Amino acid sequence: MPEIARFYGIVITLLYKEHNPPHFHAEYGEFRASFDIETLKMTGSFPATAKNLVKKWAKPHQEELLKMWNSKKITKLPPLI
């Protein structure tokens, strides 16, 4: 899966060929989760602190993430600082 961001040990990936709803994946050590782009609802197992960091990162990038999903053009996004 193409990596679109990395911060605090969390790797964010997006694969637009997957099932709906539009979502992205996050990995943190042995933990894996997917996040709905529109609602940021999480599916999977992730530590609470890491989950909050992913949501904090994703909130200002929701429009860009959805555009990537729909256009099938993946680009890197800035990390959470």
Label each region the model flagged.
Residues 1-20:
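Short, charged/polar N-terminal "headpieces" of proteins
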